[in-house]
Amino acid sequence: HRTYLPLVGFALVVASIFSWVYLTCLKLSQKKVLGFSMHLGIILFLILFSLIAIDRNKVWKDEFTLWTDAKHKSPGLIRPYNNLGQAYDKIGNYDQAIIEFQQALSINPNYFFGLNNLGNIYGKQRKYEEAINYFRKALIQKPDYSPAHYNIARAYHLIGKRQDAVMAYRKAIQYNPYFEQAFYNLAYLSMELSNFDESIENFNKFIKMQPNHSKAHFGLGNAMMMKGKLDLAMLEYRISGKLDPKFALPYMNMANIQMQIKNIPAAIKNYQKALKIKPDMASIHLSLGMIFYQFKNDIPRALSYLKNALRLRPSQPGADRIKSLIVELENKKPT
């Protein structure tokens, strides 16, 4: 593809040479046979190269044809095997991707791109220990390779080694200060570990790069809420809900905060907004049922929400207590 623009100049030069030769020959001889021969030669030349171009375009049909052709023509080069492996990875053909990456590594066992890519495939197959092994090998070859630190962090997280994951995410960020997903993942992981200050710091750094990311604002709101900064949490939840009108959780969490501060009318509104977006959230039906029972003494509405909560999640914790409350309220309901 990179030769297309330079070929314009090459084509002009070749065409000029043909024109010069053609005109020179006509000047030297006025014979019609020569002119006919020149025309015929040019036509045959164009037909030949057109056929070659058509055949060559088949190679450029897609990534598979291109890199398969490249590896057959240059079997000693690593890049065609690696790129063909990535193409198989994209379509989910992981077994074939492994074969291609292993062939690349047979040429150069220290090829860190191939080691990292092979680790990714094993990670997608949930073979996390094998994945970690290849990420480590990649990092031995290139200790500052940020994607391998990120990938090994994800693998550590998935097998429960959360502190190791934190350290690896920090390394990924150290070598690439603009690694957005590393900031995002580290922020959520830090919150899991109750490191709320680090979580807030990383969410803020991520949001500087992705200010319109609804779930990042939601995560920052959660971290603020866990720190007891309820006003800041409410602010982030509002931003999150505004950025993604189909995201119900910010409204649910705003309602939870409003319940803490006894702002019952506002809590009801936000719970109902959440249900409008996602009507099958059993926990919100339960919360509204309890609100209308305990704070509004509205038995019909309380019953409606409680029954929906039980219908949507029959085996939820406390299901027996909900059933008992429904029976109790049914007996209290005016006839």
Please name every model-derived segment.
Residues 293-335:
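Terminal, low-structured helical/coil segments at or just beyond the last alpha-helical repeat
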Residues 1-136, 144-151, 178-181, 185, ...:
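Polytopic membrane enzymes that build or remodel cell-surface glycoconjugates and lipids
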Residues 79-90, 112-124, 147-158, 181-192, ...:
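Conserved alpha-helical positions within TPR/SEL1-like repeat arrays
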